[in-house]
Structure formats: structure tokens, C-alpha cells
């Protein structure tokens, strides 16, 4: 690198780090830094940059982290093409971040776009596109900018859907989000949106304002409004946080027995990508069986999300019947051999 370019980079880095003298920014960054440093197996990170205030605050904090800890951090923005201005916004984000010595790669969503359930489908597509890209680059951890308001909204949306314990408590600070082994990290989940907005305005003085965030045709917008109304009835944020924390503790206990069930009552062959399930696997409480089988199907079928609960419950019922022989679910084949089951990917020859 030329001396002139190196000096310019140092000036930019010094300017970015100077903002850490701000008490609020410093407090959030120290917690952010400690969280990432405790991800012992992470050698590099990817950051999902939507261009909104939350993600730009995340971008700034992760850039400071990379400077101070000499850690490789890469940044990705998805041009979803759902709005006419999305490509222009992507260019603005690239140029803005470049002026702060942050190289942001834009991934274009090509192909057919959803006509219904737009927000959910789009969110899942953004995840899958970025995860596909970072897997090629051997990056195993992705940072996303979910914050405290997102936690509450997600909890209520899943409650309205009738989600079980896992669904209601799965929006944690760290969780496996992909069959490809990518870990999703939410380092800002403890913080309010107003704090992140403060950081973004202080550093960048710019962010993309997504009009869908105020469109009441979308459930998330209506839920956001509902939360404000519920405060008047006594369900404030502290009570929501306590409820989610209690559910999360209960969920962790069940996950312990799920891991134990998989370890003791199944075996995995890496050479032919096959699970062998022993009879005692299905002698556990239903929730443990359900989650254990779901995890195995995700791994074998290389699926981002688990099977629908109804489909999986029906499959468990079939497997337990004496007449069960063979079935297909989530891109996997489940076949009974003597008192055991083998599970392997569909359209693949058994070894």
C-alpha cells in the first residue's frame, strides 16, 4: 500500500476510534467487544448491512472492533430489487462506507420476487444469500443488527402464531442459523433502537429509511404499534424481557436433553452423510424427540429452516407405528432397518 493511502487510512481509523470517547458509545462498544472476543472459535466475521440505522451502528462498532483487535470483518448488503430505489441505495451505502475505509459488497437478489408474505420471505432470502456467500469465504459467524425492539416484536409475532417454547425463546444473542454451520450473532439485542440511532447519526449522519417500517399492511408494523398500547395496560418492556428470559432458561434445559439424546441414541457417518437412529431415541419426552429429529433433518437435508411442526409431528407418529417402513420429509429419506432407522439425503445413493 502506498504511503499516502496508508496515512489516509490511519486518519480515518483515528477519527472512528475517537468517537469511542463518547460515554454511551464507549459503553455499548465495550460490551460488544467482550461478546465477540468470547466467540473463541471465530477467526473472522461477516456483517449484514441493510443500510438502516441499526445496521449502520453495527457496522461502525464492528469496524472499531476489527481495528483494535486485528480481526477480519467483511460487510455485505443485499440489493433486494423490491423497490425501484434499492439499487441506488446500495450504491450510496457502498460509497458512504468506503469513505470510512469499509468495503461493503453488494449481493443482488435475482429472480422472482414474492407477492405475499413479502417481509418474511425477503428476510429469509437475505440471510440465505449472505450465508451462501460467506460460506464460500470460510466465514462461520454473521453479525446482524437486531435490537431490543426487534426482540419484543418477534416474541409477540411468534406468540400470535402459536409457537412453542423454542420459537418464543429462540431470538437469542447467539444461535446456529444454518445447516452450513454458520452462527448468527445478535450483539446489539440488549440495546434500544434510540441508542443505535444516536450512534448512526453521530458517525454517518445518514441511513436508509425503509417505508415498509411504517406500512400497517405488514404485521410487524401493527405489532410495533400494539406494544405501545400494551404499555398502557401494564405490560411494559421490563415484564416482556423477564418473560422472555424465563422462557429462554426453560428452553436451555430442554436443549441439554436434546443434545444428550442425539449423542447417546444416534450416530452420524460423515463419509456417506447418514444418521443411524437407535430405538431409544424415540423413548424420550415428545419435545425432546421432536427437536432431536428436527436438528438431524436440518443437518442431513441441508435446510436453513426446520420442517413445519405439523409435518414433523405426523412423521414421528408414523415412525412409532409398527407399519412404518420408509418415508420422505424435508429432502431426507427415513428408512426402517430392523430396530433402527437410517436417515439420508433424498436423491442420493445409500452407501
Language-model features: locations:
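AMP-forming adenylation/ATP pyrophosphatase catalytic core
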Residues: 1-54, 72-76, 80, 109-114, ...
Amino acid at each position: 500500500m502506498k504511503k499516502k493511502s496508508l496515512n489516509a487510512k490511519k486518519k480515518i481509523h483515528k477519527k472512528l476510534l475517537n468517537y469511542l470517547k463518547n460515554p454511551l458509545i464507549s459503553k455499548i462498544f465495550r460490551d460488544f467487544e467482550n461478546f465477540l472476543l468470547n466467540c473463541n472459535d471465530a477467526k473472522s466475521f461477516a456483517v449484514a448491512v441493510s443500510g438502516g440505522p441499526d445496521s449502520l451502528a453495527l457496522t461502525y462498532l464492528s469496524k472499531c472492533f476489527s481495528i483494535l483487535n486485528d480481526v477480519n470483518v467483511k460487510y455485505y448488503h443485499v440489493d433486494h430489487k423490491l423497490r425501484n430505489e434499492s439499487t441506488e441505495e446500495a450504491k450510496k451505502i457502498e460509497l458512504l462506507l468506503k469513505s470510512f475505509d469499509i468495503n461493503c459488497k453488494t449481493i443482488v437478489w435475482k429472480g422472482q420476487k414474492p407477492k405475499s408474505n413479502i417481509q418474511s420471505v425477503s428476510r429469509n432470502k437475505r440471510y440465505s444469500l449472505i450465508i451462501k456467500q460467506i460460506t464460500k469465504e470460510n466465514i462461520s459467524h454473521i453479525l446482524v443488527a437486531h435490537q431490543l425492539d426487534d426482540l419484543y416484536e418477534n416474541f409477540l409475532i411468534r406468540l400470535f402464531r402459536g409457537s412453542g417454547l423454542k420459537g418464543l425463546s429462540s431470538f437469542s444473542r447467539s444461535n446456529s442459523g444454518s445447516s452450513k454451520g454458520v452462527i448468527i450473532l445478535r450483539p446489539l439485542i440488549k440495546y434500544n433502537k434510540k441508542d443505535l440511532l444516536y450512534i448512526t447519526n453521530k458517525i454517518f449522519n445518514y441511513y436508509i429509511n425503509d417505508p415498509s417500517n411504517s406500512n400497517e399492511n405488514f404485521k410487524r408494523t401493527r405489532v410495533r404499534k400494539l406494544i405501545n398500547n400494551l404499555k398502557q395496560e401494564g405490560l411494559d418492556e421490563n415484564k416482556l424481557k423477564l418473560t422472555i428470559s424465563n422462557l429462554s432458561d426453560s428452553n436451555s434445559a430442554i436443549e441439554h436433553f436434546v443434545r444428550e439424546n442425539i449423542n447417546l441414541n444416534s450416530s452420524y457417518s460423515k463419509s456417506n452423510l447418514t444418521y443411524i437412529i437407535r430405538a431409544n431415541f424415540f423413548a424420550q419426552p415428545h419435545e425432546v424427540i421432536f427437536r432431536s429429529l428436527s436438528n438431524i433433518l436440518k443437518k442431513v437435508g441441508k435446510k436453513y429452516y426446520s420442517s413445519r411442526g405439523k409435518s414433523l409431528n405426523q412423521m414421528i407418529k408414523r415412525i412409532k407405528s409398527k407399519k412404518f417402513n420408509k418415508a420422505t420429509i424435508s429432502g431426507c429419506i427415513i428408512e426402517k432397518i430392523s430396530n433402527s432407522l437410517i436417515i439420508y439425503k433424498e436423491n442420493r445413493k445409500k452407501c
